[in-house]
Amino acid sequence: MFRLSTTPRFTRCFQGRRQRISIAQIPPVQFISYSSSAAQSLSILPNSAFRSLRVCGARFQRFERSQLGLEYCVPRRQIHYYSMGLDKKVAMDKILEGKYPAKEHARKVVEYLRSKEPEAEGVLYLEAQKTVMIEDNDEAAPFRQRRYFYYLTGCDLPDSYFTYNISTGKSTLFIPPIDPESVIWTGLPLSPEEALALYDVDEVLTTDMINAHLALPNQSKVWAIAPQISTHITFLEFPQKDFTLLKEAIEEARVRKSEYEVALIRKANEISTVGHTAVLKAVKHVKNERDLEALFIKESIANGAREQAYHSIVASGTAAATLHYMKNSEGLDGKLNLLLDAGGEYKCYASDITRTFPINGKFTPESRSIYDIVLSMQSQCTSMLKAGVSWDEVHLLAHKIAIEGLLSLNILKGDKDEILKARTSVAFFPHGLGHYLGMDTHDTGGHPNYEDKDRLFRYLRVRGTLPEGSVVTVEPGIYFCRFIIEPYLKDPAHAQYINADILEKYWEVGGVRIEDNILITKDGYDNLTTSIKDVDEMEKIINSVY
């Protein structure tokens, strides 16, 4: 974290080696230093204060100036680990010092309800996830908070309730009371006073008061989510009930992220980048996929992301052609590449990052050529992004670039427009370009059409235009999966465009996917992912001393 201090510190530590900074006539000013378990370190001094710099072990490569009027030095090795930028890091940490903006989210939800029903009034009602016991066991199952509840509360407590009065704007959170029998096992729970200080709500009561609260007079209508209502909650006091529109309203509101949500996703990316870098450094020195999965999870937990956004995909060799490979238990010997699709979850918000790299530290010519095509697909598609852009058009561009690249390698042959019209490129790029990201890895509001007769768009998880404030993944890929490609080779409509002899050289490549998390802005985008994808940089890290 960043630390502010009025006492100048002229010695910093980078990876256990002391950095000595001698400054002549240093004024009494504030200094900021950054440290983390990833051995990232910034030594920062006012621009006018720099006189001389001596570093033991870590050599500095460049100086950068922040918008705060500070100039800071970046070690060569650090550039591999961390490239968010000082100003974004400071802004992110500052935002996350505040409360999760539950009231802002509630107002967005009401705005959507009133776009459908202009006179919408009444009470929003939501329940947290229940404590569920593992079948035939006395242990509770791992807890995952309901996202609809979290969006309006920021509360990660099980067995809780929430109401929001549309007319008054008053939000009330109900949390479990103290159970003396449980204290000895799990300790004291959060008190209502502590919860009120922690969460962005107006009132905190205990759950034994929920029915009395719902029975208050003059409440015209209740809005709830049908499958998420306890049996003892009847809403008899409400003359009107709507159990469908609230879910839709929350799903649509979640598409446009608040500033706080963006900071959470950026933080999840920062943590996951540490894990991805650790895997890069270790891949040449371990024997099994499971070793790398364990390493990523370890780094995630150590840096603040106890949960994973999804099960990690650690696919070596030809297994990388399986989009959602789950085994993560195969040996690495004799295989070319590793595809790592892994993201930590930070306070209920996901990151979703994919990188592909050579296990032995050097891409083969075939692997490098495919990687370069995929990287071009990603960079050109990302450059299109801004509010209002058609995601269908961006996805279409990815296929056009893939076709041109595969034609240049003679894997495909013929006219590029005819290949696109035939949809032959789907054999090599069978999934959508990306999806919304937020509390869920495949977040809400994308309106996919899995019944689309056009196979090019069938698995595109976002349809239509991208609004400002949305976060989308950009994850093109090219795969050499026999199960998918061989039917195309047997179909004359597609076989005429595929050079089967050339294809034989590429089966071992498996698959290449590169994935970043992108915030859509009014006039462009902000890439929230800083994990390395430059080939030279990746190979340098893999071949570094472990």
UniProtKB/Swiss-Prot annotation:
Specify the superkingdom.
Eukaryota
The record's cofactor note says: Binds 2 manganese ions per subunit.
GO BP annotations of the record are:
proteolysis
The EC designation for this entry is 3.4.11.9
Q: Does the keyword Protease apply?
A: yes
Instruction: Look up the record and name the cofactor or cofactors this protein needs.
Output: Mn(2+)
Q: What is this protein called?
A: Probable Xaa-Pro aminopeptidase pepP
| Lineage per the UniProt record | Eukaryota, Fungi, Dikarya, Ascomycota, Pezizomycotina
